[in-house]
Amino acid sequence: TLPFDELETMIKGVYAPARFLEIFRDYIYFQDREYDSDEKEIVCRYPQFFAARLLKQSIVKSVIEKSGKGGTYFGATGCGKSYTMMFLTRMLMKSKFFRSPTILIITDRTDLDDQLSKQFVGSKRYIGDETVVSIDSREKLRQELQGRTSGGVYMTTIQKFTEDLQMLTDRSNVICISDEAHRSQINLDQKVKITDTGVERTYGFAK
């Protein structure tokens, strides 16, 4: 019957020794105590587990092949993408392969940036790095990346990056995680708007 099928799936899936240890090690999220007096713990959903794991594998592959393409994950609204990014960030920071990487969390709206910044800044112990900073200007972004040799997690918006921006860093272990990345790659057609001051032409970010 169905209840027993679900129980069997959980026992064979979650409680397989190697997988259970993997979940226990990387997929139980908790905020720093000063930000969460109740010390609530959040355990991953199965899509978050497999997404974060496969993304890490894909990022490793992209470094080996020097493709610069770490992968794409599509998650519906409310599926917990911010926690998936948190699980992934923790695994990347702990990975010996990446040798203490620097991670950029990029969004396309300030409200998303504020939301992620609050969550990530309050999770330094879980992430495993004391430098978790929200970037509010291009100059600060440049200073932080050019002056850093390892580690650090930075939250910023896609608007901070422009074609005339100088080389920020040539390190191979800087990893970008972009939330809602598709929105900067669509609606590329020119939009014309007539205003009191004249004609305005706008394009999608990727134009």
State what each model feature region is.
Residues T1-T102, D111, Q115-I127, T149-V153, ...:
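ATP-dependent helicase/translocase motor core
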Residues Q48, T77-G78, T157-T162, E180-H182:
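Short, flexible loop/turn elements at secondary-structure junctions
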Residues I105, Y154-T156, C176:
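Hydrophobic positions in the central parallel beta-sheet of the AAA+
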Residues T110, V132-R142, T157-E163:
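Conserved helicase motor
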Residues L112, V121, L145-G151, Q159, ...:
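A long, glycine-enriched binding/interface module in the latter
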Residues I127-S134, S184:
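Acidic/polar loop patches that form or flank catalytic/metal-binding clefts of enzymes
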Residues I135-Y154, M167-R171:
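Conserved motor-coupling elements within RecA-like helicase/translocase cores
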Residues T162-K207:
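Signature of the SF2 helicase/ATPase Hel1-core->accessory helical subdomain module
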